[in-house]
Amino acid sequence: MSGTLLAFDFGTKSIGVAIGQRITGTARPLPAIKAQDGTPDWTLIERLLKEWQPDEIIVGLPLNMDGTEQPLTARARKFANRIHGRFGVTVTLHDERLSTVEARSGLFERGGYRALNKGKVDSASAVIILESYFEQGY
Protein backbone atom coordinates (compact mmCIF):
# COMPACT_ATOMS: atom_id res chain seq x y z
CA MET A 1 0.00 0.00 0.00
CA SER A 2 1.37 3.36 -1.05
CA GLY A 3 -0.67 5.46 1.36
CA THR A 4 -1.77 7.66 -1.52
CA LEU A 5 -5.37 8.87 -1.61
CA LEU A 6 -7.22 10.75 -4.32
CA ALA A 7 -10.17 12.99 -3.43
CA PHE A 8 -12.99 14.35 -5.56
CA ASP A 9 -15.31 17.28 -4.87
CA PHE A 10 -18.24 16.28 -7.09
CA GLY A 11 -20.11 18.92 -9.03
CA THR A 12 -22.34 18.94 -12.09
CA LYS A 13 -20.00 21.23 -14.10
CA SER A 14 -16.63 20.75 -12.44
CA ILE A 15 -15.13 18.05 -10.23
CA GLY A 16 -12.34 19.15 -7.93
CA VAL A 17 -9.39 16.80 -7.51
CA ALA A 18 -6.74 16.49 -4.80
CA ILE A 19 -3.96 14.03 -4.07
CA GLY A 20 -2.72 13.29 -0.57
CA GLN A 21 -0.51 11.06 1.53
CA ARG A 22 -1.80 9.22 4.56
CA ILE A 23 1.64 9.30 6.24
CA THR A 24 1.85 13.13 6.23
CA GLY A 25 -1.88 13.81 6.41
CA THR A 26 -1.52 16.47 3.74
CA ALA A 27 -3.08 17.02 0.34
CA ARG A 28 -2.55 19.26 -2.66
CA PRO A 29 -4.84 20.26 -5.51
CA LEU A 30 -4.72 18.81 -9.00
CA PRO A 31 -6.48 20.35 -12.01
CA ALA A 32 -10.26 20.06 -11.80
CA ILE A 33 -12.10 17.86 -14.28
CA LYS A 34 -14.88 19.37 -16.35
CA ALA A 35 -18.19 17.55 -16.14
CA GLN A 36 -21.28 17.73 -18.27
CA ASP A 37 -24.37 17.54 -16.07
CA GLY A 38 -22.37 15.55 -13.54
CA THR A 39 -20.78 13.17 -16.04
CA PRO A 40 -16.99 13.42 -16.06
CA ASP A 41 -14.55 12.46 -18.78
CA TRP A 42 -13.93 8.93 -17.49
CA THR A 43 -10.68 8.65 -19.48
CA LEU A 44 -9.26 11.54 -17.40
CA ILE A 45 -10.24 9.79 -14.18
CA GLU A 46 -8.68 6.57 -15.46
CA ARG A 47 -5.47 8.50 -16.24
CA LEU A 48 -5.42 9.95 -12.72
CA LEU A 49 -5.82 6.48 -11.21
CA LYS A 50 -3.02 5.05 -13.37
CA GLU A 51 -0.69 7.97 -12.63
CA TRP A 52 -1.22 8.18 -8.86
CA GLN A 53 -2.29 4.57 -8.07
CA PRO A 54 -4.25 5.53 -4.95
CA ASP A 55 -5.09 3.00 -2.24
CA GLU A 56 -8.41 4.71 -1.70
CA ILE A 57 -10.63 7.35 -3.28
CA ILE A 58 -12.49 9.88 -1.12
CA VAL A 59 -15.60 11.51 -2.59
CA GLY A 60 -17.08 14.51 -0.81
CA LEU A 61 -20.67 13.93 0.27
CA PRO A 62 -22.71 17.13 0.00
CA LEU A 63 -25.11 17.43 2.93
CA ASN A 64 -27.26 20.22 4.30
CA MET A 65 -25.99 21.90 7.47
CA ASP A 66 -28.39 19.79 9.57
CA GLY A 67 -26.90 16.61 8.09
CA THR A 68 -29.84 15.80 5.83
CA GLU A 69 -29.34 14.93 2.19
CA GLN A 70 -29.80 17.40 -0.63
CA PRO A 71 -30.43 16.80 -4.37
CA LEU A 72 -26.68 16.65 -5.14
CA THR A 73 -26.09 13.98 -2.46
CA ALA A 74 -27.55 11.15 -4.56
CA ARG A 75 -25.53 12.25 -7.59
CA ALA A 76 -22.29 12.26 -5.58
CA ARG A 77 -23.12 8.74 -4.31
CA LYS A 78 -23.74 7.61 -7.89
CA PHE A 79 -20.39 9.11 -8.98
CA ALA A 80 -18.62 7.26 -6.14
CA ASN A 81 -20.37 3.98 -7.05
CA ARG A 82 -19.37 4.39 -10.70
CA ILE A 83 -15.72 4.92 -9.78
CA HIS A 84 -15.79 1.74 -7.69
CA GLY A 85 -17.64 -0.20 -10.40
CA ARG A 86 -15.40 0.92 -13.27
CA PHE A 87 -12.03 0.73 -11.57
CA GLY A 88 -12.50 -1.61 -8.58
CA VAL A 89 -10.80 0.80 -6.18
CA THR A 90 -12.01 1.40 -2.61
CA VAL A 91 -14.21 4.50 -2.49
CA THR A 92 -15.24 6.26 0.73
CA LEU A 93 -17.80 9.04 1.00
CA HIS A 94 -16.84 11.85 3.39
CA ASP A 95 -18.94 14.75 4.70
CA GLU A 96 -17.97 17.89 2.80
CA ARG A 97 -20.06 20.50 4.63
CA LEU A 98 -18.51 23.98 4.38
CA SER A 99 -15.52 22.79 2.30
CA THR A 100 -16.38 25.14 -0.58
CA VAL A 101 -16.86 28.10 1.79
CA GLU A 102 -13.49 27.37 3.40
CA ALA A 103 -11.82 26.92 -0.01
CA ARG A 104 -13.19 30.23 -1.33
CA SER A 105 -12.07 32.04 1.80
CA GLY A 106 -8.53 30.62 1.62
CA LEU A 107 -8.14 31.35 -2.09
CA PHE A 108 -9.51 34.87 -1.68
CA GLU A 109 -7.04 35.57 1.14
CA ARG A 110 -4.16 34.50 -1.10
CA GLY A 111 -5.24 36.15 -4.35
CA GLY A 112 -8.43 38.19 -4.15
CA TYR A 113 -11.26 37.77 -6.62
CA ARG A 114 -8.90 36.65 -9.40
CA ALA A 115 -8.08 33.53 -7.39
CA LEU A 116 -11.74 32.45 -7.26
CA ASN A 117 -11.57 30.47 -10.50
CA LYS A 118 -14.22 27.69 -10.43
CA GLY A 119 -11.75 24.85 -11.04
CA LYS A 120 -9.37 26.18 -8.39
CA VAL A 121 -12.19 26.45 -5.85
CA ASP A 122 -13.34 22.89 -6.59
CA SER A 123 -9.85 21.41 -6.26
CA ALA A 124 -9.17 23.47 -3.11
CA SER A 125 -12.42 21.99 -1.74
CA ALA A 126 -11.13 18.51 -2.58
CA VAL A 127 -7.96 19.29 -0.57
CA ILE A 128 -10.09 20.35 2.41
CA ILE A 129 -12.23 17.20 2.11
CA LEU A 130 -9.14 14.97 2.06
CA GLU A 131 -7.36 16.77 4.92
CA SER A 132 -10.58 16.60 6.97
CA TYR A 133 -10.66 12.85 6.30
CA PHE A 134 -7.06 12.56 7.54
CA GLU A 135 -7.81 14.70 10.63
CA GLN A 136 -10.57 12.29 11.63
CA GLY A 137 -7.93 9.58 11.89
CA TYR A 138 -8.57 7.57 8.75
Curated annotation (Swiss-Prot):
It is found in: Cytoplasm. One of its GO terms (biological process) is rRNA 5'-end processing. Keywords: Cytoplasm, Hydrolase, Nuclease, Ribosome biogenesis. Pfam families: RuvX. One of its GO terms (cellular component) is cytoplasm. It is an enzyme of class 3 (hydrolase). GO terms for molecular function: nuclease activity. Its EC number is 3.1.-.-. InterPro entries: RNaseH-like_sf (IPR012337), YqgF (IPR005227), YqgF/RNaseH-like_dom (IPR006641), YqgF/RNaseH-like_dom_sf (IPR037027). It comes from the Bacteria. CDD domains: YqgF. NCBIfam families: RNAse_H_YqgF. Belongs to the YqgF nuclease family. Could be a nuclease involved in processing of the 5'-end of pre-16S rRNA. This is Putative pre-16S rRNA nuclease. The gene is yqgF.
